[in-house]
Amino acid sequence: MSNTSWFNKDEFKKNIISNCKSLFRKNIDEADKQQLFQSVAYAVKEIIIDRWIATQKEYAKQDKKTVYYMSMEFLMGRALGNNMINLMAYDEMKEVLEELGMDINVIEDQEPDAALGNGGLGRLAACFLDSLATLEYPAYGCGIRYKYGMFKQEIKDGYQVEVPDNWLKDGNPFEIKRSEYPTVVKFGGYVRSYRDEKTGRDMFVQEDYRAVTAIPYDVPVVGYGVNTVNTLRIWDAEPVDTFNLSSFDKGDYQKAVEEENLAKNIVEVLYPNDNHYAGKELRLKQQYFFVSASVQRAIAQYKERHDDVRKLYEKVTFQLNDTHPTVAVAELMRILMDEEGLEWDEAWDVTTKTVAYTNHTIMAEALEKWPIELFSRLLPRIYQIVEEINRRFVEEIKAKYPGNQDKIRKMAIIYDGQVKMANLAICAGYSVNGVAKLHTEILEKQELKDFYEMMPEKFNNKTNGITQRRFLLHANPLLAAWITDKIGDGWITDLTQLKKLKVYVDDAKCQQELMQIKYKNKVRLAKYIKEHNGIDVDPNSIFDVQVKRLHEYKRQLLNILHVMYLYNEVKKNPDMDIKPRTFIFGAKAAAGYKIAKQTIKLINSVADVINNDASINGKIKVVFIENYRVSNGEIIFAAADVSEQISTASKEASGTGNMKFMLNGAMTLGTMDGANVEIVQEVGIENAVIFGLSSDEVIRYENEGGYDPMEIFNNDQDIREVLMELINGKYSPDDTERFRDIYNSLLNNQGDRRADTYFILKDFRSYADAQKIINERYSDEKAWAKSMMLNIASAGKFSSDRTIEEYVHDIWKLEKVHIPDVK
């Protein structure tokens, strides 16, 4: 499967042994598991380093355009196994470890997931980096080196408890600190302007500011089967003066450590709770911190080889992954004008050819806005620039739509006391893309309609994708080997080749083999559940899985309400013909998101009742997997029978979990939302189960009204029974009010928020019927196996390789740079 003629087994073994000595002063047989992991990781890194150096040299030599992919999150997962696979030396390295008495799985389990992201946004960025390196395109990922990530989730008494995710406590063996590139980032103070006598230009200087030093840490991104090693550059913050000794000596201890704390706070956690002012301020600081450092460094790199910054766009493109890095627009303008001496029009010309924006959400609340007071106080010069961009943009709007105040209200960057980041990104970006066909259509016709009418040429769609190297080759070795046995290993770098499996869909032997692989993966997950949850689950039951961020629009609540309904049905009809079903949830709720956290408690309370009811003979089990992340996700995707993708239609931009499940042979149970629409197009409606309102219907109800959940409550006895159980103590005997907020959210208008905002009761019956169809289909093993195989065979479109090639062709205009073999 791999050409590893370059791999020197003896040298690799020798390196592991010597690493163990030099890092820990121990022989292999004395080291603990973490020390063994570190010793192996450094030995793998040594192999990567030569390619990494060669990559940077070749990039410098060929001087081709580079994309800087800016993202608040990079959900990388574990690096060791992935690097071994992409070096095409997994089996050989595994053999060396066995000779040294190590089990590769135990060693891999010692590595914490890199806590640099939370949800799909960050995982997409990680998949994109994998594809960019594999496809040999020059690229940097730019982000923050969070000390604690978002949080590690623990479940105590059924409640989510957030504890710090101290993923760096043993160090990250794959990163390299680049102290030689310190970059100063300034906050606060005021802007002094003066006229330059020589040039007659107005000059602007930020004074009385507080500063931190951004220090980059570089993490290698290894391409599969190529010599390319790209870089994820994550920034740490250090005080400009490490320690203010004179203040300390004068007894002003507070001031002495102030600078230290300013720096420390910036990189502490991902998405600090912004329910309060200090949290909002910290988020904006984080965004400007990593964007300013990344843009400054990119321009410095450009200037090492080029004199004319007016041609920056020929060599550099900044891709903004969602609105978080949008301040890059104004920061680039600031550098070009204040430091490089360009006039406004020249700087604007460069900026609008260099920056491109990906929109990831239809939810208006997630399109970031900052109070003017906060923005202008924290980033005074940046605010001046945004003000001027806004003034000119509003003039353009007025010229195009005279007297249309409504257009200005919707499109202005600064309006109603707020700075609107999405509007800034669209105004300045040369490309604006959505992440699935339906999502892009909704942006163009609904959410961003005014922008689309004014500048349609900017808008385009790039349907998301996932890397098959992690989510099939690494996550599901049994299935990967089976596919390679049937069609060869070309699918690893060209996922469309999976369609060759279609000739086997009616082959009884292949169907059986596939069911056997799924069964073994379910046994692996059942073992994980027993170990972590203490619950026995039956691998012969249907594994029905919903793992994703916890948000009301993703409707974990619909899922658990249906479980409550199904439980009632089984209790009433003990002889009911139902395939045993294991409902598996995994989700983190944002720390300040009250109803999401109550939903987790509800799921766990329902699990406690159902899992301990012997009278139903194990027909239903409910499992909540603690601290869902990439590494346990890999075990889950491989084992799922049913993929729950049940967001309210029109709300999920794309989703990528749906693709990971499909690639591993799960049946999609979902609404026509996000990329589900395209999955159904690829696999055929008969190989998925679709339910619920369409996005058009949802949007119509939202705009015109006409939906009253109380009507359903009054007329549907089963739904009423389930909702009453939220408040009659069935699942909370010690506190009947515990789930009152959930009950109220479904039935009562609250302020300007409509009852059942996400149409859970409206879609409930349709969902329950869809679940019955799943039950029937699973009873026909041959038909189910055929559907499984068709799902795998139809997943070719959903590789991030395809997505990246589209970005390259339509937006970035990059050229491949082939890295020759390292001698």
Predicted feature descriptions by range:
Residues M1-K823:
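A conserved ligand/cofactor-binding region detector
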